[in-house]
Amino acid sequence: MNSSTRYLSLLSALVVLVKGNPVPSALAELMTSGWTSGEELGTDGETGAPPKWEKMIKMLVHEVTTLRNQQFVEEFQKPVEEISSFSQHQVPSTPPHLSKTLCSASNKEACLQEISRGLQVYQLLLQHVKAEYPQSTLLPSVTHQTTVLIGLVKDQMKVAEVVEDLSASERKRVLGEVSTGTEWERKTSVHAILRELRNFLVDTKRALRRMGKRGKDFQ
């Protein structure tokens, strides 16, 4: 994929508007607010703008956080201040934190592969979120931007073909782990997926920034 195609893919993600979707406010926050960690954004050497992936991740973190909070309040009838009380709920198929993978080493290619594979799993798990929380107006944007981010990450690989799509058996296993159980268990699995996706995105942002500092060509 060439730079023009990548730019158009990113642009399409930023302008996608779902009816009733508060994307405009997310765009406003993207342009005006700082990153949650307080770190300054990296810049593109030619334009002085943040790298494409960083803008995309920032948007996604904002929207996934909003979606997680909305689902928690609406589905569990609890204030968002009590969200930490659900931290013990886990989903077996969610990817491990990047700090526990090859991203903790200095192998850039292996780390990019881990990120791409993890995002593919979350892309699939978002189907479960859609099935259990169909009224969400944010979810279509989150799903679309996750797909675009996978493309941006693969663009940085030397051999993107190494990361294959999930097989039919893998897809069946992942969805089977979250689609069964009681209504309560399915709701808590949605919450856990959104929580862990947010954490994975933050880990991804940190890993990509480390790579960017090691090589100016990583934009």
From Swiss-Prot:
GO terms for cellular component: extracellular space. Residues 1-20 form the signal peptide. Expressed in spleen, gill and gastrointestinal tract, ovary and brain. Highest expression in ovary. The keyword Cell wall biogenesis/degradation does not apply. Induction: by LPS. Keywords: Acute phase, Cytokine, Disulfide bond, Growth factor, Secreted, Signal. GO terms for biological process: acute-phase response; cell differentiation; cell surface receptor signaling pathway via JAK-STAT; cellular response to interleukin-1; cellular response to lipopolysaccharide; glucose homeostasis; hepatocyte proliferation; immune response involved in response to exogenous dsRNA. It holds the Pfam family IL6. Cytokine with a wide variety of biological functions in immunity, tissue regeneration, and metabolism. Binds to IL6R, then the complex associates to the signaling subunit IL6ST/gp130 to trigger the intracellular IL6-signaling pathway. The interaction with the membrane-bound IL6R and IL6ST stimulates 'classic signaling', whereas the binding of IL6 and soluble IL6R to IL6ST stimulates 'trans-signaling'. Alternatively, 'cluster signaling' occurs when membrane-bound IL6:IL6R complexes on transmitter cells activate IL6ST receptors on neighboring receiver cells. GO terms for molecular function: cytokine activity; growth factor activity; interleukin-6 receptor binding. The gene is il6. This is Interleukin-6. Component of a hexamer of two molecules each of IL6, IL6R and IL6ST; first binds to IL6R to associate with the signaling subunit IL6ST. Disulfide bonds join 103-111. It is found in: Secreted. InterPro entries: 4_helix_cytokine-like_core, IL-6-like, IL-6/GCSF/MGF. Belongs to the IL-6 superfamily. It comes from Oncorhynchus mykiss.
